[in-house]
From Swiss-Prot:
It holds the Pfam family ArgL-like. Induction: Expressed in equally in both exponential and stationary phase in rich medium (at protein level). May serve a regulatory role in expression of downstream gene argF; in an argL-argF-lacZ fusion mutation of the start codon to a stop codon in argL increases expression of beta-galactosidase. This is Putative translational regulatory protein ArgL.
Amino acid sequence: MNNYTYKVNFNSISGVRHARIKCPIYTKNTF
């Protein structure tokens, strides 16, 4: 269970990084 949640968190963090590269304005509004 902990490993699964860790993978989900890691994927979400990497997804946020890609989103910032694509559209930083959108991520600034969300975060």
